[in-house]
Amino acid sequence: MKKKILLLIIISLPALGSEIIDKRKQLFQENKDHMRFIYKAMQSGDMDPIINSSMAIEKFASEMPEYFPEGSESRGASDNIWSDFEGFIKSAKANQLAAQKLKLAAQVNEIEKLNGLFNELSNTCKSCHRSYKN
């Protein structure tokens, strides 16, 4: 009986890894969409999409490391994620904080700060991609 349970667990592991990989790909695509929404909203001066999209990016960034458990390696994810997981966590935290700063500026209508904060947020994405994306 124990052998059957162990075999079932071993067989299920790749499927679990595949599910989390698919989910993180979906969330990264949503992040990309949110960046576009923010950019367009900055052109029109509409703060609501900036606030909402910044909140979504902030939320995902706070959870991002959870979507990279050991054994969930994929073609697009660099091995550096797992060999330097603390660095990866710091990069996700930088992204979270940049999204939070953009959200806060939009909430108080600090339009003059938005371009700089959007660039800061964008740079956290680029920095992480350089280090942790294939």
Label every model-predicted segment:
Residues K4-L13:
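Sec-dependent N-terminal signal peptides
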Residues I11, N119-S122:
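Processing junctions and N-termini across compartments
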Residues S18-E120:
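Extracytoplasmic c-type cytochrome modules immediately beyond a signal peptide or single-pass transmembrane anchor
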Residues L121-K133:
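The canonical Cys-X-X-Cys-His
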